[in-house]
């Protein structure tokens, strides 16, 4: 029985261990289309450099086998350099670590308030880029 519990504990540990590779790095990203849902109504196109500033605030992250009902923060459609795209939904938990989901799997980690700030900063940079292109 003790061996079964040890194997079971090891499985839980491995299945919820740190997961970073689920989120592509900035080097893999061509562009990110972001729609903010939390307290704002913003849609914009972010760059790989913007993603480089956002991603660290979502990590380290672990699989959450029993996610709660959280308020939506933002949706990001990530267009990768290999032509594939993926959707990342970011959530705003009432307390504790941040949260996001990819492909129906939920993850806890990072800090959703800092993620939101990084997204809003990216929006400001996108507005500045758009203004500079007009001039």
Predicted feature residues:
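Sec-dependent signal peptide recognition
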Residues: 2-10
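N-terminal signal peptide c-region/cleavage motif recognized by signal peptidases
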Residues: 15-17
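Function-determining sites in protein domains
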Residues: 20-135
